[in-house]
Amino acid sequence: MAKAEKTAAVAEIVEEFRGSTAAVLTEYRGLTVSQLTELRRALGEGTRYSVVKNTLTKIAAEQAGVTGLDDLFVGPTAVAFVSGDPVEAAKGLRDFARANPALVLKGGFVEGKPMTADEIRKLADLESREVLLAKLAGAMKGTLAGAVGLFAAPLSQVARLAEALREQREGQSAGVAEQPAAEAAAE
């Protein structure tokens, strides 16, 4: 590979790193071309899976400001550059690795934080961002409804007490008005 080609390849990988929310490094030794194609389909549109040269990718990672991946650039390496939801990509890689043991997760980074292969597997066990946000919104809605009930209860109690006090005063004033009339009739 000529120096100009290497420079262009590094620049392309730098852009991939900078444009990605996550990147997962894998070892693909033993996978066929059809299996790699199947993996790319399984990862979906938000993820680009590329076989890379370790030296060039290491240089590109340094230039992109991605740290903590140096030990992972050993053996045949492919990188899943994730521009969408990292959880969905991690699930796709985990599930494919279960079905095809030749695919080995090495590690990667998510939102700038280096992650081990075990951490990526744990990430895959999480629910997607949309599901977590929906659950949070539901919990907040329930909490707010409960708070409204708590605030409304004392107000309704005060209203009932005020009504009872008004009725009691009306009853007393009617009783006081009847007393002078009864005294006048007795005289």
UniProtKB/Swiss-Prot annotation:
<dbReference type="InterPro" id="IPR002363">
    <property type="entry name" value="Ribosomal_uL10_CS_bac"/>
</dbReference>
<dbReference type="GO" id="GO:0003735">
    <property type="term" value="F:structural constituent of ribosome"/>
</dbReference>
<keyword id="KW-0689">Ribosomal protein</keyword>
<comment type="similarity">
    <text>Belongs to the universal ribosomal protein uL10 family.</text>
</comment>
<dbReference type="InterPro" id="IPR022973">
    <property type="entry name" value="Ribosomal_uL10_bac"/>
</dbReference>
<keyword id="KW-0699">rRNA-binding</keyword>
<dbReference type="InterPro" id="IPR043141">
    <property type="entry name" value="Ribosomal_uL10-like_sf"/>
</dbReference>
<dbReference type="GO" id="GO:0015934">
    <property type="term" value="C:large ribosomal subunit"/>
</dbReference>
<dbReference type="GO" id="GO:0070180">
    <property type="term" value="F:large ribosomal subunit rRNA binding"/>
</dbReference>
<keyword id="KW-0687">Ribonucleoprotein</keyword>
<dbReference type="Pfam" id="PF00466">
    <property type="entry name" value="Ribosomal_L10"/>
</dbReference>
<dbReference type="InterPro" id="IPR047865">
    <property type="entry name" value="Ribosomal_uL10_bac_type"/>
</dbReference>
<dbReference type="GO" id="GO:0006412">
    <property type="term" value="P:translation"/>
</dbReference>
<comment type="function">
    <text>Forms part of the ribosomal stalk, playing a central role in the interaction of the ribosome with GTP-bound translation factors.</text>
</comment>
<dbReference type="InterPro" id="IPR001790">
    <property type="entry name" value="Ribosomal_uL10"/>
</dbReference>
<keyword id="KW-0694">RNA-binding</keyword>
<comment type="subunit">
    <text>Part of the ribosomal stalk of the 50S ribosomal subunit. The N-terminus interacts with L11 and the large rRNA to form the base of the stalk. The C-terminus forms an elongated spine to which L12 dimers bind in a sequential fashion forming a multimeric L10(L12)X complex.</text>
</comment>
<protein>
    <recommendedName>
        <fullName>Large ribosomal subunit protein uL10</fullName>
    </recommendedName>
</protein>
